[in-house]
């Protein structure tokens, strides 16, 4: 069944599409690494992983970073995919248990799990033990995105699982969106602007940028709620336009800082914006939301998506 709607292009954003030079190598290596765990019993799941091109998002978001960072981003995207596969077939309690094990592995990767390791946890341990230089701030309980948020008693993956079987309101969807996907990419950007620089990192405009970046994406919403009418999409576009205007205003009015900090601030802010730009391009290019018609639909024309 096909759902037709109209989306405006994401062309007024000052940041353009940029794909890192390490994309193909990082994608190949990360795919081989993921497949070495034999995570999928069915060819369909493996095909879906390839179809969604999870490595593409990491390469679009970190196009200026060294190969190791791009590869790490690809690995994490694949871990998220495997995590979702496990949670999709679990009930609420089971998804919570998976989350708890993975959280424990994040903070104590050297610990042996007495009850046996689950696959997402095993993959997380491998990454953290292989890359001990990853700052703790990168995978703290909030930034990594696996932990419950203070505003919601449920782990994000449980909320996301429940949203598949119920029709969330716009506010409910916004609450879930604050806790998922983007946080890991925004957290990776934080490594160039250490948390120790509290005055800069926690300035109100910098906080606002981090909160606004995930909401620059509206393209995934029609697929998630399975049935938005065009009027609602128009409302979302207006909402996103307001977020974008506020995002750009915050960048233009960031406070002055010491010269030695300014370069890191610029990198940090540009990575926040480039993630938003890359996520929009990935939405159309990956096949996740629009199948093989993504490039065709990335224009000011009526858009079709399989329901």
Swiss-Prot record:
Keyword Coiled coil in record: no
InterPro entries xrefs: Isoprenoid_synthase_dom_sf
Composition-biased stretches (Polar residues): 296-307
Keyword Cell inner membrane: no
Highest taxon listed in the record's lineage: Eukaryota
Positions of the UniProt region annotated as Disordered: 287-307
GO molecular function annotations of the record: metal ion binding
Entry keyword set: Magnesium, Metal-binding
Family the entry assigns: Belongs to the terpene synthase family.
Protein's name according to its UniProt entry: Sesquiterpene synthase-like protein Agr10
Native species: Cyclocybe aegerita (Black poplar mushroom)
Name of the gene: Agr10
